[in-house]
Amino acid sequence: MNTIVPDYSRRDFLKKSSFAAAGTLSLVSLPLMGASCTPVQDELNIIGPKTGYSPQIGTLVSMMNWMRNVIENQVSDLQQEQLDFLIDDKANTVGAMLMHLAATERFYQIHSFEGKNWGDWSLEDSKRWSVASGLGDKARKKIKGNDLQYYLDALGEVRSHTLNELKNRDDEWLLSVDNNWPWGPTNAYCKWFHVVEHESNHNGQIKFIMSRTPS
């Protein structure tokens, strides 16, 4: 699923995401329900504020870390042949999808942290990330022949920059609304939660491909 910036209407988006949003908002609101926003334990399976971040951003970071751990654990034993495996000539490889996750996050960085319009990428970023972002035939031809560490390094490089940038922002920024986003009025929290949800979508695809990969 390649839904970086969906072009469907806000009504359709809300209809499709209502159940997920209900569960997500219950998690997001946890830090605000009590009198304190004390950082929770620095444990992977504890969602909540984190030391070094504002309360809401820390909660987002804990969700980002949890989902990334799921992805990395799932692919931890894959060899190059498995990363390059195609179910059919229209499919995407696991390797390409890992690069796609890194590309998506990089483009959200540029938009969110640099204040650029979607698609207003530098030549350097376009050259490095556009093929992975688009997937499809170009990615099938270009993204192959790499070992797992190549993809983990790309994911780690991008994520490190995201976390450093988020440390310099506060909850007011996270809750600020972009009235010109294609989905309709959308805050930075929703955009970055989409990065998490996007990884979850592709995690299912990766799991399916791995179940069909010759042993």
What do these predicted ranges mean?
Residues 1-8, 12:
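N-terminal secretory signal peptides
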Residues 10-33:
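N-terminal export leaders
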Residues 18-19, 41-51, 61-65, 69-72, ...:
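Short, contiguous alpha-helical
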Residues 19, 69, 73, 77, ...:
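A generic structural signal for well-ordered alpha-helical segments enriched in polar/charged residues
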Residues 32-41:
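Bacterial Sec-dependent signal peptides at the C-terminal "C-region" and cleavage site
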Residues 56-59:
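Short Lys/Arg-rich basic patches
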Residues 77-84, 164-176, 211-215:
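Surface-exposed helix-capping loop/turn segments at secondary-structure junctions
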Residues 131-175, 191:
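Acidic/histidine-rich alpha-helical segments that form the ligand environment
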